[in-house]
Structures are given as C-alpha cells and as structure tokens.
C-alpha cells in the first residue's frame, strides 16, 4: 500500500492510496470461493458450481464489493500509520479501476485541530460571594404569596402592582398600526410586558376613565416600522384590581410540602431551596466566565463537519420543543443555529484538550454528590438516586457533567480569580 497525505485547505486533508493489483486479485478470488460455496445455479449441486461460471456471473459485483471493503480498510490503516485524526465522515474519491493493475483512490476529510492551550493565566474570573439572608427568605415568601394571590376589584386609582382591564388603540402620526389595538386586555402591572411608559401612563387613573398616553417604541423593537417611533395610545380603563395575599396559615403552608404547617418549617424549606439554587447559580456564573476566557484566549479552527453535526442536533432539539418531527427539523434554516453550534464545538474541543492534558477522569464521589444535589429537589430523593444508579445512560451523562466541572476547575486553578460580595437577588437577576 502506497500512501501520500496533502493539506487541501485549513483542516482539510486529502489522502491518496494505491492498492497493489495482486492484493485486489487475491481478495477477489477469496470472495469468489466463498460465493461458490453458497450459490445455487441450475444444473449444479450447491457448492459444486465451477469457478469460471461463478466468476462469469458474480465477478463484477464481487469485485465492486471487494474494492469498497479494501478502500475502507486501507484508509483506516493509512490514518493509523500517519497518525491522523479525522473529524466527520470521509469522502471517498475512486480512481479508474483496470483489472490486473494497481488501483489508486483518494479520501478527503477534515482533521481535528491541534490545540495548544495558552494564556490561561490571563483569564479573569469574578466569583460571587453570597449568603441567603432572612430578608431574602422574607422576599421569597412574599413571592410565593403573590403567586397564590387572588384579585379583588377596587375603586381607587391603579398602582404599580395592580391588574387592569383595558381597551386600547395605538397610532403613529395619526394612523393606527397593525397589532396596536385590543379589547378587554388584562394587564398585570409591574411585569414589564409592555413598552416603556405604557404602564406609567395608566397609573393614577381609575376604572371608567378614558385617556391618551404618549410613548416611544424602543430602537430595538421587533417591528421594523415602529422602531424608535413616537406613538399615542387611546385607553379605556374598564377595571382595576388589587392583589389579596393569602395569610401564612397552616393549610397554606402545607401546600408546599411542609408537613407540620409551621411558618418556621416553611422558612427552613424555602431557605434550603434558595441555598441549593444559589449554589448552582454561583457555579454557573464562575463556569461561564472561565469558559468565556478560555475561548477568548484560544482561537482555534473548527472542522465544518463537526459544526454541521451540531447544527443537526440543535435542529432536532428545537423541533422537539415545538412538537415537530425529523423532517421538519431538517427544514429549519441552518443560519438559526450556526453561531451556537460553532460555539458549542469550540467549547467542547477546548475542554476536551483541558481534560486530555490534565489526564482527568470523572470523580465518582463528585458524580454521587451531583446526583444527590439534583435529587434533593424532588419529593423522594432516594427514589431518584436509585433510578439514576440503575440507568447507564443517565449515569454516563452525569459523569460527563462531573468531568466538565473538573475541567473548568483545572482552568480556574491557573486563572486570576477574585471574589466579590453580592446579594441573592443581584446574582439571580444576572442569571436570568
């Protein structure tokens, strides 16, 4: 076997391989012998068909199959010999085959980039230092009460957290615009659903009033014809409602799985959940900075084949989220996913190199801890832990999570890490 390797462009490679004629003929004869043992031809007993007849009838197809098999096997031998690491499926380019002559063909493919991690010491990471305070727990209890609140109609003016029912008609330069009109529209104030200034214009008005508010659409508004435009909205305020928050009664508290129904028990459960959420948020915040720094410090070429493969994964995930099928997934424009796919491939390659250079393996104690932490959010943690322990795929996924965490820690060990005190709300708002 003769092999030559050339770089076509970037990560592209072209391997040219020549297979000796006698190797081909030996393989063809061997396969024809196997065929002769199995075929049935009228006038001959099974296994007794003369080889010249077998060759005459099956020679062309056997030769084609043998060539395909030899091309594949010789390519594998070639990349092992040349220490080449292909990324994605190879493209075979057959040459012209002439019986009795050597056969030359080419294989085109991309290789993984050679990565030499650099400048890890320049990566800057700010680690949030946060404690869950009594005030944070109070705020979370208020949020829980608001989620369970009922609405009661009131006579007074609309406030920042009231709910209003309105009719409205919007216009720009005196002309109504598409999507700018609604009847019996229910708006819970304070949630940021409307454009800036809209809710402020409603505050202070009472049910039964009709009025006009002036607003300006943001420059980044989704409708091109409305970006940055001044608009007027004619409002008919039909109803104003205020929240009625439930008291922290025993029955109310038991809805959240606190068996004794006590306020102290609810506060303890809320604090535990907040601390678990906080731990994950700090971990994600630090991880995202470390990965961002790793990517910025190491500019690498990415095989197009890996990006294409990742785009297909993202397409299928998107289709599943919206109830689509395989065919619909592949019809989604690749441009929607290309940037995200490239980013995921780059991160995967760089973290893979961190794992390789540091000879990391998944720490089983860490895997166990991750599963226990995740299971603690469920009603029966033991059942969840047992379910994971019996499912190889889930365990492998969790090992990958642990290994990625270990890789991030290896990056952090060389990075410049500073600590910054912050509050629970500030950190959670950054995560949103």
Swiss-Prot record:
Record's GO cellular component terms: cytoplasm
This enzyme's EC code(s): 5.2.1.8
Gene Ontology MF, one: peptidyl-prolyl cis-trans isomerase activity
Entry superkingdom: Bacteria
Enzyme class at the top of the EC tree: isomerase
GO annotation, biological process: 'de novo' cotranslational protein folding; cell division; chaperone-mediated protein folding; protein transport; protein unfolding
Compartments where found: Cytoplasm
Main location: cytoplasm
Catalytic function, reaction form: [protein]-peptidylproline (omega=180) = [protein]-peptidylproline (omega=0)
Keyword annotations of the record: Cell cycle, Cell division, Chaperone, Cytoplasm, Isomerase, Rotamase
UniProt-listed InterPro entries: PPIase_dom_sf, PPIase_FKBP_dom, Trig_fac, Trigger_fac_C, Trigger_fac_C_sf, Trigger_fac_ribosome-bd_bac, Trigger_fac_ribosome-bd_sf, Trigger_fact/SurA_dom_sf
A Pfam short name: Trigger_N
Limits of the PPIase FKBP-type domain: 161-246
Keyword Cell cycle listed: yes
UniProt note: domains: Consists of 3 domains; the N-terminus binds the ribosome, the middle domain has PPIase activity, while the C-terminus has intrinsic chaperone activity on its own.
Function in brief: Involved in protein export. Acts as a chaperone by maintaining the newly synthesized protein in an open conformation. Functions as a peptidyl-prolyl cis-trans isomerase.
Subunit structure: Homodimer and monomer. In vivo most of the ribosomes are in complex with monomeric TF. Uncomplexed TF, however, is in a monomer-dimer equilibrium with approximately two thirds of TF existing in a dimeric state.
Family as reported in the entry's similarity comment: Belongs to the FKBP-type PPIase family. Tig subfamily.
Annotated protein name in UniProt: Trigger factor
Species whose genome carries this gene: Escherichia fergusonii (strain ATCC 35469 / DSM 13698 / CCUG 18766 / IAM 14443 / JCM 21226 / LMG 7866 / NBRC 102419 / NCTC 12128 / CDC 0568-73)
């Amino acid at each position: 076997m003769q092999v030559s390797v050339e770089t076509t462009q970037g990560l592209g490679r072209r391997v040219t391989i020549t297979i000796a004629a006698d190797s081909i003929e030996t393989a063809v004869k061997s396969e024809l012998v196997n065929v002769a043992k199995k075929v049935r031809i009228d006038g001959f007993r099974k296994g007794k068909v003369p080889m010249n007849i077998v060759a005459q009838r099956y020679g062309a197809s056997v030769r084609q199959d043998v060539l395909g098999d030899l091309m594949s096997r010789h390519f594998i031998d070639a990349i092992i010999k040349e220490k080449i690491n292909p990324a994605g499926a190879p493209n075979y380019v057959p040459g012209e085959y002439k019986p009795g002559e050597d056969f030359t063909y080419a294989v085109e493919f991309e290789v993984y980039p050679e990565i030499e991690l650099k400048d890890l010491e320049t990566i800057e990471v700010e680690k949030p230092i946060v404690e869950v305070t009594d005030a944070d727990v109070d705020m979370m209890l208020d949020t829980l009460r608001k989620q369970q609140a009922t609405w009661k109609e009131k006579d007074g003016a609309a406030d920042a957290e009231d709910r209003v029912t309105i009719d409205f008609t919007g216009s720009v330069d005196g002309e109504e615009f598409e999507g700018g009109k609604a009847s019996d529209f229910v708006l819970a104030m304070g949630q940021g659903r409307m454009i800036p200034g809209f809710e402020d214009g409603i505050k202070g008005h009472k049910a039964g009033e009709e009025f006009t508010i002036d607003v300006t659409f943001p420059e980044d508004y989704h409708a091109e014809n409305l970006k940055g435009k001044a608009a007027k909205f004619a409002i008919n305020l039909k109803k104003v409602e205020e929240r009625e928050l439930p008291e922290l009664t025993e029955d109310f508290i038991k809805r959240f799985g606190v068996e004794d129904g006590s306020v102290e028990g609810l506060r303890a459960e809320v604090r535990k959940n907040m601390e678990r959420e906080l731990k994950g948020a700090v971990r994600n915040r630090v991880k995202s900075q470390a990965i961002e720094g790793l990517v910025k410090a190491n500019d690498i070429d990415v095989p197009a084949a890996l990006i294409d493969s990742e785009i297909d994964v993202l397409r299928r995930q998107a289709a599943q989220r919206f109830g689509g099928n395989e065919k619909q997934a592949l019809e989604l424009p690749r441009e929607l996913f290309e940037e995200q796919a490239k980013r995921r491939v780059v991160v995967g390659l760089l973290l893979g190199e961190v794992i390789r250079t540091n000879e990391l393996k998944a720490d089983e104690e860490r895997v166990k801890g991750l599963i226990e932490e995740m299971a603690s959010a469920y009603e029966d943690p033991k059942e969840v832990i047992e379910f994971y322990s019996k499912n190889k795929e889930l365990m492998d996924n969790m090992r990958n999570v642990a290994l990625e965490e270990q890789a991030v820690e290896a990056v952090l060990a060389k990075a410049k890490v500073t600590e910054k005190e912050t509050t629970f709300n500030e950190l959670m708002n950054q995560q949103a």
